[in-house]
Amino acid sequence: MQFTKLGSSPLVVSRVCLGTMTWGQQNTEAEAKEQLDVAFKEFGVNFLDTAEMYPVPTKAETQGRTDLIIGKWLKESGISRDKVVLATKVAGPGISWLPGRNGENSRVRKRDIIVSVEASLKRLGTEYIDLLQIHWPDRYVPIFGANAYNRSLEREATPFEEQLEALNELIKQGKVRQIGLSNESPYGIMKFSAAAQQLGIQPFVSLQNSYSLINRAEFDSGLSEVCSPRNENIGLLPYSPLAGGILTGKYASEQDTSSCRLTLFPGYMARYKQSLAVEAVKKYCALAKEVGLTPTELALGWCYKQSDTVASTIIGATSVAQLRENLEAFDESKWARIDNARIDDIHRQCKDPSKT
């Protein structure tokens, strides 16, 4: 396993981060703990990402289960807490049943951030969070597959300064070490950056956005410039590098997908099942076969090899076999077979087909 500093922070993270959003829904506690043991004890991963709303699809009766599982593992694993870089996320607006919100829709106001972190710390059984991220913006932003900005959806939002004040308070209390953003735009990052400088608050060090072979143009343009070490020095943490599993090729083959996420939860991540996305996946699968890689190795290897852009790629699995394949794809001898020029050619033919 390789390691890198996360953005401008002193956090040293593995270049693969273990995602957790299926734990407590598709995966049992025992299965989740086995995944943690494999990733941390066999492959040397040290980076773990969760969220207050997990597992996904999110619902009141399961919310928080993922954190509880992680908390038990942290206590039982025998791994020192300081050897685990633990990241979590404060939910954006729109969920009415999160702890401490008194039945109101979640927001990213100061009190929401503080209540969220206190509840997360309790579930996780830890005294601090290494990386606290805002899961999605309090203001309107086209995310989760939406493409064009729709001005009619603009709304009043929590000031950037208020959000930063809450985060800074938690940092001063020792409950949060570093802060990051998720599903954010260039405008949002720069507004936060300017406000943080004005208030004398430490900067955001990471950006967790969707990034994959079929969803890359948004980052490759404006966000890449913003996050560059020459500019804001923010580390990219790609989520959905396999586009919900679509890029494994299993949904386009004769494999049994009855137990897979997109089959179990119709409508979930439907953006990845559009006809143009399916066509792009077929092209990437054909390229993978030609160069002697699995579709998974091609899709993940493309992310992994971008060390100048990607800090750590977030992977998720519903079985240990899947997890091992994802981790074994972190292999420079496999990356050597990946021709970025040919990948870029497919991208030009099917540019961001998951966008609506």
Where in the sequence are the language-model features?
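N-terminal binding-site loop/beta-alpha segment at the start of enzyme catalytic domains
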Residues: 1-89, 111, 127, 172
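Active-site mouth loops of central-metabolism enzymes
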Residues: 20-30, 99-111, 151-157
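Aromatic/hydrophobic pocket-lining residues that form the small-molecule binding cavity
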Residues: 32, 66, 113, 117, ...
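Beta/alpha (TIM)-barrel catalytic core signal, keyed to glycine-rich beta->alpha loops juxtaposed to Asp/Glu
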Residues: 56, 137-345, 352-354
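Surface-exposed, active-site-proximal loop segments in enzymatic domains
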Residues: 57-61, 92-107, 140-149
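Structural motif corresponding to the early beta-alpha repeats
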Residues: 77-106, 135
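An active-site-proximal structural segment forming one wall of the substrate-binding cleft
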Residues: 109-128
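Active-site groove signature of glycoside hydrolases
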Residues: 122-145
